[in-house]
């Protein structure tokens, strides 16, 4: 399911990446220089199945197996911007997928803890990330399992992102709330047939939610 090349060469397909950033991302209002630099530097073709390599920079999500997808480039850039990543932020990612969103967050300086529900995708993501930056998965944590279950481990995060849609808003008793530090941000889609992207910001004993508009993601599994 991953690219057949043994290494990810950032010097290949540079013009395609530049066109993607200009026409799909900047044109839609993304101005964060760090996010734009990340999107320009990461070879997206190394994070899609080899059969879709020629379509890697198209303005749409692509299948990666198990009815999962790699998100549209703009969606990755938008969500990365909304997280307001600061260097050293501990970020919990639900749904490693192909590893592309992880790569963008890593480029922004995040310390990643990422969970993938499908073991073959987990293994492929590690291969993809290692081709991109050898040794990177040894310096961060990528595990196979359930996101909510992993949060019961007692770790705390400045930022959390779900790449799959929750069925309901998490309350203050949820592992999401308990694992997010005060002042932290949780970004997630919610809904079944109709979905919206939500941003939650935690205070000391509560959190606020804001809807950011309609989106379409695969449902969260492993609950």
Ranges and model annotations:
Residues 2-92, 100-104, 108, 121-124, ...:
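Class I SAM-dependent transferase core
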Residues 84-208:
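Conserved nucleotide-cofactor-binding alpha/beta core module
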């Amino acid at each position: 399911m991953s690219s057949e090349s043994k290494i990810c060469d950032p010097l290949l397909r540079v013009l395609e990446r530049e066109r993607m950033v200009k026409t799909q991302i900047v044109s839609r209002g993304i101005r964060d220089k760090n996010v734009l630099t990340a999107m320009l530097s990461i070879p997206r073709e190394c994070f899609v199945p080899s059969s879709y390599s020629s379509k890697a920079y198209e303005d749409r999500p692509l299948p990666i197996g198990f009815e999962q997808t790699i998100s549209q480039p703009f969606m990755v850039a938008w969500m990365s911007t909304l997280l307001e990543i600061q260097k050293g932020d501990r970020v919990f990612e639900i749904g490693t997928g192909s590893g592309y969103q992880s790569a963008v967050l890593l480029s922004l300086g995040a310390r990643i803890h990422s969970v993938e529900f499908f073991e073959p995708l987990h293994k492929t993501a590690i291969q993809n990330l290692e081709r991109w930056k050898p040794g990177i998965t040894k310096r961060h944590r990528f595990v196979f399992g359930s996101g909510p279950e992993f949060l019961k481990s007692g770790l705390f995060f400045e930022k959390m992102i779900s790449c799959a849609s929750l069925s309901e808003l998490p309350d203050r008793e949820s592992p999401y709330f308990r694992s997010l530090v005060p002042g932290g941000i949780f970004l997630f889609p919610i809904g079944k047939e109709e979905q919206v992207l939500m941003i939650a910001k935690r205070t000391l004993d509560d959190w606020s939610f804001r809807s950011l508009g309609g989106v379409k993601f695969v449902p969260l599994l492993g609950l």
